[in-house]
Every structure is written in C-alpha cells, then in structure tokens.
Amino acid sequence: MPNPAELAAHHWGFAAFLLGVVGLLAFMLGVSSLLGSKAFGRSKNEPFESGIVPTGGARLRLSAKFYLVAMLFVIFDVEALFLFAWSVSVRESGWAGLIEATIFIAILLAGLVYLWRIGALDWAPESRRKRQAKLKQ
C-alpha cells in the first residue's frame, strides 16, 4: 500500500483542479451577490407569463390520458430510433437483419393493435363511445 506522500504526489493535479473549481465557484457567487439587483416586492413573487397578467392558478389537473399518450410516444419513439439504426446498417446486416427487423416491426404492430383494442388510444369517455356506436347502428 502506498504511503500518503506517494498518494499526494500522484493526485496533486486533481487536488489543484478541485481547489480551482471551488475558488471559481466562490468568486462567481460573491460577484453575483455584490453586483446583482436586490429588488423585493409583490411583483417579484408572481410568475412571469410573457408580460401578460397571470390568470387562474398554476395547478391544473390533467387527465391521465395525457400521461398515457406521453408514455406511448416515448416507447414508440425509442423503437423508431432502433429502426433508424437498422436502416443505416441494412446492407451490412443482410437477410438476417431484414428478418429481425420484420419481426421487430410485427411486434410493434401487435402492440399498437393491442393498445387500440383495449381503448388506450380513445379520448372520448366510454359513455360517449357507446352512444356513437348506437347511432351508427
């Protein structure tokens, strides 16, 4: 095990870097507190909405459908990235890559059909969907 003198000799550059970072941080915070504005008042506690007087509260309740659609978008977007990577290397992957991509796309389509069948992509409430189904008959 190396003694402390050897460790200090090997890590002096890192210690100098850390001291420089801490010094720069202290300098930037000190200068900003000295030169920055110190205006306090009612208008400082209000949210800024592009110069428009804010109306209503900031606590909006969103439907869970928005979160579901966001998750589905992320999932299918990542899968589109996989397909893009495959399309870049389509010549190198040959027939095996084509078969694998076809299976991957089939799984994607099966997932999309499943989501469609369970109603994950329907925005209307179930009562309205039933009414519209009765009107079509």
Swiss-Prot record:
InterPro entries in alphabetical order: NAD(P)H_OxRDtase_bac/plastid, NADH_UbQ/plastoQ_OxRdtase_su3, NDAH_ubi_oxred_su3_sf
Q: Which reaction does it catalyse?
A: a quinone + NADH + 5 H(+)(in) = a quinol + NAD(+) + 4 H(+)(out)
Q: How does it sit in the membrane?
A: Multi-pass membrane protein
Keywords assigned by UniProt, alphabetized: Cell inner membrane, Cell membrane, Membrane, NAD, Quinone, Translocase, Transmembrane, Transmembrane helix, Transport, Ubiquinone
Look up keyword Cytoplasm and say if it applies: no
Cellular location of this protein? Cell inner membrane
* Classification via Gene3D superfamilies: NADH:ubiquinone/plastoquinone oxidoreductase, chain 3
> What Gene Ontology terms describe what this protein does at the molecular function level?
NADH dehydrogenase (ubiquinone) activity; NADH:ubiquinone reductase (non-electrogenic) activity; quinone binding
Q: Quote the protein name from its UniProt record.
A: NADH-quinone oxidoreductase subunit A 2
Which organism is this entry from?
Answer: Pseudomonas aeruginosa (strain ATCC 15692 / DSM 22644 / CIP 104116 / JCM 14847 / LMG 12228 / 1C / PRS 101 / PAO1)
